[in-house]
Amino acid sequence: MVESIARVRHIRVTPQKARRVVDMIRGKQAEEALAILKFAPQGASEPIYKLVASAMANARVKADASNSFLAEQDLYIAKAFVDEGTTLKRFQPRAQGRAFRINKRTSHITVVLATPDEADVATTAKKASK
C-alpha cells in the first residue's frame, strides 16, 4: 500500500468553510475528487484542489523512488481533515471611539492518499456481496 501525505498550513480560509469542501471528497478516488473540486463553487476548493494534486505528485515520486508501479486511478483519499490555524486579530473602528474585533481565521489542511490493500479490496467485496 502506497501512502502519500500533503499538507498546507496557515491558509487564509476559515476552518468551517474548508471542512465543508473536505467533507465532499473524503473517501473518494483521487481523480474523482479533483473533478469535484474543479467545479465546486466554494472558495476553499481551489487550495484543496492544489493540495490533492500535490498529494498525487508525492505518491508518484514516492513510487518512483522505491521502483514500484503506481496506478494513479487506484489512489483514493484515505484521510482528509482541517485543523484550526492561527487567528489574525484585527480591529474595526466603530462609533463613539469603540472598536470591534475581527478574527481572520486560518486553516491547516491535510490530505492522505493511499492505494487499497488486497485485504481492503477483499473486505469491500464481501460487504458488497452481502
Curated annotation (Swiss-Prot):
SUPFAM superfamilies: Ribosomal protein L22. GO terms for biological process: translation. HAMAP family: Ribosomal_uL22_B. The keyword GTP-binding does not apply. It holds the Pfam family Ribosomal_L22. Transmembrane segments: none annotated. One of its GO terms (molecular function) is structural constituent of ribosome. NCBIfam families: rplV_bact (TIGR01044). Belongs to the universal ribosomal protein uL22 family. InterPro entries: Ribosomal_uL22, Ribosomal_uL22_bac/chlpt-type, Ribosomal_uL22_bac/org-type, Ribosomal_uL22_CS, Ribosomal_uL22_sf. GO terms for cellular component: cytosolic large ribosomal subunit. This is Large ribosomal subunit protein uL22. This protein binds specifically to 23S rRNA; its binding is stimulated by other ribosomal proteins, e.g. L4, L17, and L20. It is important during the early stages of 50S assembly. It makes multiple contacts with different domains of the 23S rRNA in the assembled 50S subunit and ribosome. Part of the 50S ribosomal subunit. It comes from Clavibacter sepedonicus. The gene is rplV. Keywords: Ribonucleoprotein, Ribosomal protein, RNA-binding, rRNA-binding.
